[in-house]
From Swiss-Prot:
This is Electron transfer flavoprotein subunit beta. GO terms for cellular component: cytoplasm. Part of an electron transfer flavoprotein involved in syntrophic growth of S.wolfei with butyrate. Probably receives electrons from butyryl-CoA dehydrogenases, and transfers them to the membrane-bound quinone oxidoreductase Swol_0698. It comes from Syntrophomonas wolfei subsp. wolfei (strain DSM 2245B / Goettingen). Heterodimer of an alpha and a beta subunit. Belongs to the ETF beta-subunit/FixA family. Induction: Highly expressed during syntrophic growth with butyrate (at protein level). Seems to be constitutively expressed.
Amino acid sequence: MNLKVLVCVKQTFDTEAKIELKDGKIADAGINLIINPYDEVAVEGAIQLKEKGVAKEIVVVAAGSDKAMDAIRTALAMGADRGILVQQDTAADEFARAVALAEAIKGENPDIILAGHVAADDGSSQVPTRVAEILGLPHVNVITAVEIAGGKATCTSEADGGTQVTEVSLPAVISSQVSWNEPRYPSMKGIMAAKKKPVATAAAAAAESKVKILEFSLPPAKAAGIKIEDEPEVCATKLAEWMKNTVKVEVK
């Protein structure tokens, strides 16, 4: 098969990063940015389809500032063929981002559109579904396996403690769960090759965000834990009293 696979990726904060606020906004200075881990799974899935002879070309597309170029380069180093950066204000909401991505996708006419089912930073799980709706394509969410044959995708998804198998005609939007695969680490050869792979830039399609973020706030700090240092019997008594009087646990 000679299918074109397009993967939507996003640049997000490192999941281990400590988030700080300044004037009601996220202070991103000095915070490490990475490719969204869920999108990384989608990239790996695309590469595996190419290794199986299903896909001929893998295109990655990201919407955002120039910083999103790092996410694209990571995908290229993993094995994608070329990239597209849709230049867009990072404050754009999921609707505006989906419009921008969908417009870029239209120009590529891919057979399969992959994405992580959620972004690690906002957790909205909206963009793949919105892209599918805008393009008028079928969408299968949180897949853990996919087989391509006869112009159709047979997808396995998690569902209520079991699995669900869905068959859709291509082209289609398919969003992945992290359990689909284990993304590979880019090799040094891949990293060097990624620098020479083409990345086109495009202006985002005009779309006004439907959601406006007024400010961010951090959750209240957790109270310090209780530490009891004494003989075991005394510790047990003190702990029982604390549970009874503080958290209102019935102690018998």
